Amino acid sequence: MRKVRGAKAKKYAKQFLSLVNIDQVPEIVSKLETVVMLMQKEKQFRNMLTSPSFKDEERVGVIGYLCEKLGLPEETKKFLNFLSIEGVLIGLGEIVRYINALYLEAKKKVKGIVTSAVELPENIKQKIVESLKAITGRDVELQYEIDPSLIGGVRVKVGSTMYDLSIKGQLGLLRDKLIKG
């Protein structure tokens, strides 16, 4: 089995997106992430899908059963079988990350994570979404997390950009300024 990274993973992701209905991608990605998680946690399952000691027919059978149980479309089953036969199914996690990134790009969306010390009220969540939409020029999908160590305020990560408006972050900046003199 060969690892799949970078341009090769992106190529497979583009192939996948050309096979499926773009509106089904979020649901399919969610189910593929389940497969990736199983491959990471269950060594026997991973070996069955990736080891050359198992015949292609055996792997195709397992993939077919898995796709049926997860309710994955026929195109996805064919794609997983293709990856298995190519010997690159071990790189499914990286491929799924590219599928998700290319989907968001095609839909002109970005994903972000908002971390706060306490649960945020809906009106604040809406203001954050509107502000990020104005900054990025794209629709924003946010995931919310709670981290009491922030003390107050929020930390927002969108793509590779971090906006730290937390008290903890501001205290860190103040500390750095005091140290530098």
UniProtKB/Swiss-Prot annotation:
Gene Ontology MF term list: proton-transporting ATP synthase activity, rotational mechanism
Q: Which residues form a coiled coil?
A: none
- Signal peptide start-end: none
Matching Pfam families = OSCP (PF00213)
Q: What does this protein do?
A: F(1)F(0) ATP synthase produces ATP from ADP in the presence of a proton or sodium gradient. F-type ATPases consist of two structural domains, F(1) containing the extramembraneous catalytic core and F(0) containing the membrane proton channel, linked together by a central stalk and a peripheral stalk. During catalysis, ATP synthesis in the catalytic domain of F(1) is coupled via a rotary mechanism of the central stalk subunits to proton translocation. This protein is part of the stalk that links CF(0) to CF(1). It either transmits conformational changes from CF(0) to CF(1) or is implicated in proton conduction.
Which PANTHER family does this one have?
Answer: ATP SYNTHASE DELTA CHAIN (PTHR11910)
Q: How does it assemble?
A: F-type ATPases have 2 components, F(1) - the catalytic core - and F(0) - the membrane proton channel. F(1) has five subunits: alpha(3), beta(3), gamma(1), delta(1), epsilon(1). F(0) has three main subunits: a(1), b(2) and c(10-14). The alpha and beta chains form an alternating ring which encloses part of the gamma chain. F(1) is attached to F(0) by a central stalk formed by the gamma and epsilon chains, while a peripheral stalk is formed by the delta and b chains.
NCBIfam families found in the cross-reference section: ATP_synt_delta (TIGR01145)
Q: What is this protein called?
A: ATP synthase subunit delta
Q: What is the lineage of its organism?
A: Bacteria, Pseudomonadati, Nitrospirota, Thermodesulfovibrionia, Thermodesulfovibrionales
